[in-house]
């Protein structure tokens, strides 16, 4: 039996999962941490805390492994590291961190985002690494001239363990656009970016400071002696384990829900929420509010991403007694449209609706029935409403979804948020029994796939990054998820009609915000492009 380790740096928790080559969980560990808000609207974490958290999560996993009477972990067969995508982590040629880590949550790069989107003819959201980099170029950041290496949080942790400057294709696509045909950074856009930076006297070329992009199934490096001691300071862990290319939380969500093929959509709902649909063909036009990212094997996906999901709910649950399950189930007693109660959960800016700053609030429309059930239902609705607004923008593309799977903390109470999501999307939604393991488990599966592919290549049967005779899709379907159980909920007519009415009220409140905060010139939401269903569900 192999031992495969997956580690994921989430927004509020660092998780570690140990499983075998078929994805069966052997042990788990975790560590809680929080971001800090610095001056200038910058959200950040200390890298020292990331290392401490990784060590603590692994130590807890070791204790869990021993508790299950499986002994000590002397060696691992494969490891995978994942984390929050995007952000800004620059280093000089000596590996010295040049500036504070700027996370995906920062909405301080609007000028760079707009300029690059126009120059590339491709949406560059504010949270993307290249937007952060170019904003620092525009601002004349002192560190810019000394940058020798730019990476993500997962890329940084992977580098500490292996000494390799690499990323998986999906994680790389959150730094700089990736060409699905070449499975590498887009060559034309690289040249365009270099030309823009040359005007500002930047001494480097963008490709030279980006990590190398690798496909799922390729080897991302091996655990060094130094890396083994860093991960397990007790000295019990041997070096030598194979590491998969580090991936983003979006991609590990795809893998954890077995949604990696065309027409399949994964919804991940935790601190943030995103719905990611794998595209059969490129979108016909550019949508500034929609990310185009890539799967671990390079296929394009359209993503509607909202910065805030469960954080606002967490605050209210704490105030109302702390019993998540009871409050979530109480929401089922609320009116399908929440009876005029509306919550806005924005604890940070939300680019989809063109809001740059945080403004959580509760609103009651005239005649509203302000009950706890309606309030909780409104809070859960609002956690997915912004994502739905984004999906509505691409309604004209005629996306056909063959399946929708969901995972994340929002769905821990069975059949509550899952039903609301089905009503919101107008499509059946499945929660797999395995999806509760989360992104760390998804990353472990990618590591297992990399080890499997490497083994087949050694036997002379391989075909490179596509998995040596088994694609990632085949591996997941035939090895990991074969016979997997899940619960599927179909849209409820009353619920779907109620959510549609709630979304109208939600947008009505958003449009009133500029006058509330004294910024009448501010335009939230933009043109009224909302349609009832953002995607078509193919039931054939």
Predicted features and spans:
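Glycine-rich phosphate-binding loop of ATP-grasp-fold ATP-dependent ligases
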Residues: 99, 171-178
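Intrinsically disordered, low-complexity polyampholyte segments enriched for Lys and acidic residues
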Residues: 456-463, 533-538
């Amino acid at each position: 039996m192999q031992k495969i380790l997956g580690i994921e740096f989430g927004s509020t928790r660092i998780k570690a999962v140990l499983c075998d080559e078929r994805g069966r969980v052997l042990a788990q560990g975790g560590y809680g941490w929080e971001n800090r808000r610095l001056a200038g609207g910058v959200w950040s974490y200390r890298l020292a805390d990331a290392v401490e958290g990784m060590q603590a999560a692994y130590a807890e996993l070791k204790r869990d492994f021993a508790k299950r009477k499986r002994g000590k972990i002397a060696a691992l067969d494969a490891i995978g590291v994942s984390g929050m995508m995007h952000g800004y982590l620059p280093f000089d040629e000596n590996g010295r961190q040049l500036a504070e880590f700027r996370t995906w949550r920062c909405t301080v790069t609007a000028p760079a985002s707009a300029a690059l989107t126009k120059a590339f003819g491709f949406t560059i959201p504010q949270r993307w690494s290249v937007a952060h980099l170019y904003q620092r170029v525009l601002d004349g950041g002192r560190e810019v001239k000394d940058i020798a290496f730019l990476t993500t949080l997962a890329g940084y942790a992977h580098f500490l363990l292996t000494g390799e400057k690499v990323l998986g294709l999906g994680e790389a696509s959150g730094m700089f656009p990736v060409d699905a045909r070449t499975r590498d950074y887009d060559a034309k856009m690289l040249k365009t970016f270099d030309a823009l930076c040359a005007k500002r006297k930047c001494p480097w070329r963008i490709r030279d400071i980006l990590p190398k992009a690798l496909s799922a199934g390729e080897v991302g490096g091996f655990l060094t002696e130094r890396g083994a001691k860093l991960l397990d300071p007790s000295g019990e862990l041997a070096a030598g384990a194979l590491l998969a290319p580090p991936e983003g939380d979006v991609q590990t969500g795809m893998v954890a829900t077995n949604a990696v093929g065309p027409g399949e959509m994964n919804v991940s709902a935790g601190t943030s929420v995103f719905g990611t649909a794998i595209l059969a063909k490129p979108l016909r036009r550019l949508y500034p509010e929609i990310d185009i990212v890539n799967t671990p094997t390079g296929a394009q996906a359209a993503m509607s991403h909202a910065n805030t999901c469960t954080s606002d709910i967490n605050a209210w649950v704490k105030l109302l007694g702390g019993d998540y399950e009871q409050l979530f189930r109480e929401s089922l007693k609320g009116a399908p449209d929440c009876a005029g109660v509306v919550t806005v959960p924005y604890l940070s800016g939300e680019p989809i609706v063109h809001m740059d700053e945080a403004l959580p609030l509760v609103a009651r429309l005239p005649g509203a029935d302000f009950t706890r059930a309606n309030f909780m239902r409104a809070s859960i609705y609002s956690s997915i409403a912004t994502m739905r607004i984004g999906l509505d923008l691409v309604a004209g593309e005629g996306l056909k979804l063959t399946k929708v799977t969901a995972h994340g903390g929002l769905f821990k109470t069975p059949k509550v948020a899952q039903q609301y999501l089905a009503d919101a999307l107008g499509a059946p939604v499945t929660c797999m029994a395995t999806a509760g393991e989360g992104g760390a488990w998804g990353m472990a599966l990618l590591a297992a796939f990399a080890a499997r592919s490497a083994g087949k290549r050694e036997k002379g049967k391989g075909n490179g990054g596509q998995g040596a005779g088994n694609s990632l899709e085949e591996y997941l379907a035939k090895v990991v998820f074969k016979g997997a159980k899940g619960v599927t909920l179909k849209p409820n007519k009353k619920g779907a009609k109620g959510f549609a009415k709630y979304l109208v009220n939600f947008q009505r409140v958003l449009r009133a915000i500029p006058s509330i905060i004294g910024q009448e010139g501010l335009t939230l939401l933009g043109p009224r492009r909302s349609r009832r269903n953002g995607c078509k569900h193919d039931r054939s």
